[in-house]
Each structure stands twice: as C-alpha cells, then as structure tokens.
Amino acid sequence: MSIILGIDPGSRITGYGVIRQVGRQLTYLGSGCIRTKVDDLPSRLKLIYAGVSEIITQFQPDFFAIEQVFMAKNADSALKLGQARGVAIVAAVNQDLPVFEYAARQVKQTVVGTGGAAKSQVQHMVRTLLKLQANPQADAADALAIAITHCHVTQNSMQMSESRLSLARGRLR
C-alpha cells in the first residue's frame, strides 16, 4: 500500500490530489487547491510552502509527484511557475519524501490516452478512474492525474523488473 500526493504547481493556484494505491486499485483520499490571494510573489511562495507542508502532515504520503516545468510563451510566468514548484519540492524534501516529476504530456497520455488532451478530458477520466461523484476542480484533477501517473509508472516498472528477474531465473536453470 502506498499513499501518493500529486501536485499541479502554480503561483496563484496550486492543485493537490491524494490517492492510495493497493496493487492495481486506486482510492481517492482528498484533493483541492491552495489559493494565494496576495500580490507579492514571496508571500505567495510562503503560502504554497505552508499549504503543501500541511497537506503532507495531514495525509502522510509515501511519494510526492509533481508536474515538470514546461516552456511557456511568457518567460516571467515560467519563472514564477518554477519558483512555485521549487517551494513545493522543498516542502516534500523537508519531510523526507521521495520526489518524482512527470511531464504534462506524459500525464495526459497516461490518464486520457493522448498527450494533447483538454483539461475537461482529464477531469472526466480522473472522475471515472477514481469513481468520484463529480468532476474535481481543474487544478485538483490535474494533481490527481499526476498521482495516477506515478502509480501507473511505478506499477509498470515493477512488472518489468519482475519479468526481467523471471527471464534471468529461466536462463540460470
């Protein structure tokens, strides 16, 4: 059993999603958004750090998964996003959580089946996969999709390792 915290970073809205994985079964534990309503960036970063730290304390995750920075058209926005990611990662590292990073296209490919999926498609598939009553907020859905991607990637890695081990055992006999 593992608890995974997914983070969709943003300097104004940071989405989070927490799921439990037991084998191939995923269970929704919680999700939401950290909203920073102050104008100055240092204060927003402080709120993101405090919010992520509080979520980690509340849910006690085993793994921390976060979206990688993508190249934005606006350099200033990309820098702010990078700083928001940074404080979220520091919150995880300060609580000794292993950090995993996933590209947005990989997350969409894993959850929806296409790397160019729309936010509404991600919301729908997250709702379906986690058997939720309603679509989560867009940023929370993205964070849950990041957590689901981590489960999928680690599950596939374990299966590949087991297959290699079985092959090696077969050769040794």
UniProtKB/Swiss-Prot annotation:
The keyword Cell membrane does not apply. Pfam families: RuvC (PF02075). GO terms for cellular component: cytoplasm; Holliday junction resolvase complex. The active site is at 8, 67, 139. GO terms for biological process: DNA recombination; DNA repair. Mg(2+) 1 binds at residues 8, 139. It is an enzyme of class 3 (hydrolase). Keywords: Cytoplasm, DNA damage, DNA recombination, DNA repair, DNA-binding, Endonuclease, Hydrolase, Magnesium, Metal-binding, Nuclease. It is found in: Cytoplasm. It catalyses: Endonucleolytic cleavage at a junction such as a reciprocal single-stranded crossover between two homologous DNA duplexes (Holliday junction). Binds 2 Mg(2+) ion per subunit. SUPFAM superfamilies: Ribonuclease H-like. Its cofactor is Mg(2+). PANTHER family: CROSSOVER JUNCTION ENDODEOXYRIBONUCLEASE RUVC. Belongs to the RuvC family. NCBIfam families: PRK00039.2-1, ruvC. Homodimer which binds Holliday junction (HJ) DNA. The HJ becomes 2-fold symmetrical on binding to RuvC with unstacked arms; it has a different conformation from HJ DNA in complex with RuvA. In the full resolvosome a probable DNA-RuvA(4)-RuvB(12)-RuvC(2) complex forms which resolves the HJ. This is Crossover junction endodeoxyribonuclease RuvC. It comes from Enterobacter sp. (strain 638). The gene is ruvC.
